[in-house]
Amino acid sequence: MIVVKVGGSVICKDLSKVVENLPKYAGEAVVVHGGGCLVNELLKRMGIEPKFLTHPGGVVSRYTDLETLKVFVMAMSWINKQLVASLFARGVEAVGLTGADGGVVRARRKEKVLVVDERGRQRVVDGGYVGKIVDVNVKALAPPPLKVLAPIAVSEKGELLNVDGDQLAFEVAARAGAGRLVILSDVDGLILGGRVVPRLTPEEAEELAKSEEVRGGMKRKLLMAAEAARRGVEVVISNGLADSPIDAALGGAGTHISRNI
């Protein structure tokens, strides 16, 4: 199995290259998608300012109250069905799911989270409707047919929860024993000193994620890639806007994180 994570930065810029390349892998892939850019756009149209939390270590996450959750579910559902329809037009009968469908992805609501405020002080705040994944029904996701999964989970209490798309992709890959996980973003990989870092061990990825050299969403990607690599998954962070992006990633493009460097 190959897990392909399509980031929101790709979805909101140009998804065509990914959609054109995916049919080649329809019999062996699971697709997980993001879409934070559309969530932000819809929130602003509704007069709601998107809110984000900075955690110790510099990782940033979306604060999801009930109103934000409603918009999040709406945006992810739209992206999910558009992606399924685009694949259908190319001869792929994909099935679009959220993690809540059939309890495919179960999560525990984070009631409290530790954050760093604008003054650099650590404090505990309400966790909102954000979940930590506790179980994934990988049998339900096994291809064929190709499953397209949105990052919405369900709690034991029946609550819909926002789960991080990268975290979901890593969990699916690790729990399913996938050989490879391709993370498609709008950058060529981890870039340091103006150059793409071609290969990292899990230890190197984790060390860089905790350093000041790496910022933004790449911190979370490297931390989760390190954990997935320790569990036997080769992770590739590559450019989803490139020609044949999945082919390119599996052929050596981007940054590869693996125990077998």
Curated annotation (Swiss-Prot):
Keyword check for Aminoacyl-tRNA synthetase: no
Coiled-coil regions, chain positions: none
Localization terms from the record: Cytoplasm
Transmembrane segments: none
GO cellular component terms, semicolon-separated: cytoplasm
Residues binding substrate: G35, G36, R62, N162
This enzyme's EC code(s): 2.7.2.17, 2.7.2.19
Pathway assigned to this chain's UniProt record: Amino-acid biosynthesis; L-lysine biosynthesis via AAA pathway; L-lysine from L-alpha-aminoadipate (Thermus route): step 2/5; Amino-acid biosynthesis; L-arginine biosynthesis
Source domain of life: Archaea
GO molecular function: acetylglutamate kinase activity; ATP binding; N2-acetyl-L-aminoadipate kinase activity
Site (Transition state stabilizer): K5, K221
GO process annotations (BP): arginine biosynthetic process via ornithine; L-arginine biosynthetic process; lysine biosynthetic process via aminoadipic acid
Uppermost EC category: transferase
Family stated for the protein in its record: Belongs to the acetylglutamate kinase family. LysZ subfamily.
Protein name as catalogued: Putative [LysW]-aminoadipate/[LysW]-glutamate kinase
Native source organism of the sequence: Pyrobaculum calidifontis (strain DSM 21063 / JCM 11548 / VA1)
